[in-house]
Amino acid sequence: IIYERIKEELRAGKGLSLAIKDGFSNAYSAIIDGQLTTIITGIVLFIFGNGPVQGFATTLIIGILTSLFCAIFITRMLLEWVEAKWGTVAFSRSWSENWLANVSFDFIGKRKVSYIVSSALVVLSLISLATLGLNTGVDFTGGRTYVVRFDQNVSAEDIRAALDGKLVSDDATKSSVEVKQYGAENQMRIITQYKYDDTSEETTAEVDALIYEALKGFYSYPITLDGFISTQEDVNGIISSEKIGPAIAKDMIYSALYAVLFSLIAIGLYITIRFKRWEWATGATLALAHNAFLVIGIFSMLYHIMPFNLEVNQAFIAAILTIIGYSINDTVVIFDRIREYITLYPKRIIGDNINKAIASTLSRTMNTSGTTIVTLLAIFILGGETLRGFIFALLLGVIIGTYSSVFIATPIAYDILRRTDKKTK
């Protein structure tokens, strides 16, 4: 944001020293608003999340605060030092100097197209959720989950058939076993509700032993029970396991719903206070709900066919709240520029001010989204199997959030503003 603002000041004909000074000054409002709204989602995550999610929320908040400090103080100090010592600082290459600097597009005039596209995606998501549902993890359903590694490639169907013969209960729903490949072909993820309402150590040991008896024949070399249940990641057998009772699962569902709801309310209130018009908050909040719902809908559409696990669990809720934080950051930058243009050009019609404001922030929007996507793709490709579903949700969120900031949040706010202003007149 700061660098793009400095580039704008340079294009306006200001000297380097003044451009740096004004670039920082004019970027403060957007930076602080954007980061505070993301911190709000981090606080909500910490309040409603469990241990690992709380750790993620803490890291997120600390990261935002340190980035904010470094951007505002350290970066400025270094830029001013370089400018004073060498008299020049390059903020772009010749080929990128005016990239997206002179965009002329009627974003507001084309808003009906974006409404149709988003409505179609929402309808598809609703159909998918009604017919296919979601791949809910044990966080929300309750149950036992295991990741088991074999010393040779195995078939998920063969593993499931073997387990069905051992994990037998009077309640058929608690006897069902779900088996999916987890990463390599010699790793399987096993989910069962067999005796999941009894989380005692004795029952856990009993279930572990039954799974061992069912699966020991799939190893080319003999494996002992102790070796099988060791939960060491670098050996064969169970490399991770988790058990969640029905009461805890129910609490997690409510916590997830409260987390998303309260984050939307808190962000909506903050936008209302900062921009002094509820219309902006309504546009932003509806766009955030749109983003979260589309990510959920796409997970519903794709979990049957993707080669990696798309599970809706606590980590997924953390991803949704992170998406909300990222999307509102992008939206606030655009809203802040619209507010600035309305102040500078009060006689210009609001539609023109909005179009100019979006066009002037487009370079920053694309650069930020592009660098974020590159980083997420690197983690998605090189990271472990456990991260892929989480990172995939973030990738979807960045793409959808960038689109909605420009084509959903701002147009909705514009339409509501027009109607309320007409009623006032």
Report the location of each language-model feature.
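A structural signal for conserved, well-ordered secondary-structure elements
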Residues: 1-425
